[in-house]
A protein has these predicted regions:
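Exposed loop/turn and edge beta-strand positions of beta-sandwich/beta-sheet ligand-binding modules
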Residues: 65
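Amphipathic alpha-helical dimerization/coiled-coil segments
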Residues: 73-101
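Beta-hairpin "wing" of winged helix-turn-helix
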Residues: 45-62
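Short, charged/polar surface micro-motifs in flexible loops or helix N-caps
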Residues: 16-17, 44-45, 75-77
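N-terminal helix-turn-helix DNA-binding core of bacterial DNA-binding proteins
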Residues: 1-36
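Basic amphipathic alpha-helical segments that dock to polyanions
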Residues: 35-45
Length: 101
């Protein structure tokens, strides 16, 4: 799976304890139309797994059921790789072009 900024941010949000979709939308600042497809791709790739909460909990709180996401070991490794890639990019120095002589 190609690691994009949004997929890395979604993985990071899940790793930090934001477990259901709207929490992830809030913390990343991306719209639902971006976050939910990313969650589906991450789940399909095996980087996250999801489970619906117990229906009784949602009913008791008078809201729709939430789907909770959890980072898998491959997802944790992918996130570590993305973080390392970002650190590497951050350490690059800009190339200053030589002026014509």
């Amino acid at each position: 799976m190609r690691m994009t900024l949004i997929t890395a941010l979604v993985l990071q949000a899940i790793a930090r304890g934001y477990r259901f979709g709207f929490q992830i939308v809030d913390v990343t600042g991306y719209p639902t139309g971006t976050v939910y497809p990313a969650l589906r791709r991450l789940e399909h790739a095996g980087f996250v797994r999801s489970e619906w909460e117990h229906e009784g909990t949602a009913t008791k709180e008078a809201r729709p059921q939430r789907r909770y996401y959890e980072l898998t070991p491959p997802g944790a490794r992918a996130l570590d790789g993305a973080r390392e890639h970002i650190r590497t990019i951050g350490s690059l120095r800009p190339i200053v072009p030589k002026t014509a002589q």
